[in-house]
Amino acid sequence: MSNIVSPFSGSSRTTSDVGKQAGGTSDEKLIESLFSEKAVKEIAAECKLGCYNYLKSNEPRNYIDLVPKSHVSAWLSWATSKYDKGELPSRGFMNVPRIVCFLVRTTDSAESGSITVSLCDSGKAARAGVLEAIDNQEATIQLSALPALIALTPSYDCPMEVIGGDSGRNRCFGIATQLSGVVGTTGSVAVTHAYWQANFKAKPNNYKLHGPATIMVMPFDRLRQLDKKSLKNYIRGISNQSVDHGYLLGRPLQSVDQVAQEDLLVEESESPSALGRGVKDSKSVSASSVAGLPVSSPTLRIK
């Protein structure tokens, strides 16, 4: 058996219905049920891997395990039996190289307050009675500064064990989030989108300690590429679908084809035929024409 078994990894497209508890008639069948493609999707869905988690002002603290309880229990039961027989050097360790969280604001930029994201160990939480960050893997960002990416990494592998006796809780890495300073806003003020990959190992190790990494993301500029041509096409796309083809104030509207032919916001250049007669074609532009309503006919200007 390999020293490392990968239970899952995924992204926002990782979705599946929650399945049944893993089981099998042999070691091979059990391993298949634990780490098959179907099982990977099921446990990813259980722990909301790649799913958005809503941070609400009335629920400022949130926590999720990086591996669901049912999967840890199944692995621990199998590994313990192998360990007791001397077939494995340990009951197993959880290895998580890194966790990346994408934070997005869902309120206006003037909103006060901040978000703190922490990497936790439920074993430490059980001893301390509070969710504390391990290895200083904690970062705080102001809501007004979002969007942002936060990367966290532990310096050790988490033992696969039960805390508090046989009926206790499985020890596991987890992500805790906390809202602070949010005033006067109800509902969700931000969402987090976490990505990670967890491995089960028979042999543990320690790793170089790194501080949490925070990367500010440039907000998408929806107007930067909006030149006159794209603005004209945008208006046409809206107005042509919303034109009422009935009567307006007793007068028939122009057809959609006629409206689409009008050159909004841009004065046409002189046409060869007009130049020959000393005449310039021009299109009248008004609030009505921009809104998709009929525009006046071309006018002639005599030089």
Curated annotation (Swiss-Prot):
Mark out the compositionally biased spans (Polar residues): 1-18
> Where does it localize?
Host cell junction, Host plasmodesma
UniProt keywords (A-Z) are: Host cell junction, Transport, Viral movement protein
A GO CC term attached to the entry = host cell plasmodesma
Q: Which family does it belong to?
A: Belongs to the bromovirus movement protein family.
Tell me which species this is from. Brome mosaic virus (BMV)
Extract one GO BP annotation from the record: transport of virus in host, cell to cell
Listed as disulfide-bonded, the cysteine pairs are none
Question: For the region Disordered, what residue ranges are annotated?
Answer: 1-24, 267-303
Outline what the protein does. Transports viral genome to neighboring plant cells directly through plasmosdesmata, without any budding. The movement protein allows efficient cell to cell propagation, by bypassing the host cell wall barrier. Acts by forming a tubular structure at the host plasmodesmata, enlarging it enough to allow free passage of virion capsids.
What is the protein name for this chain? Movement protein
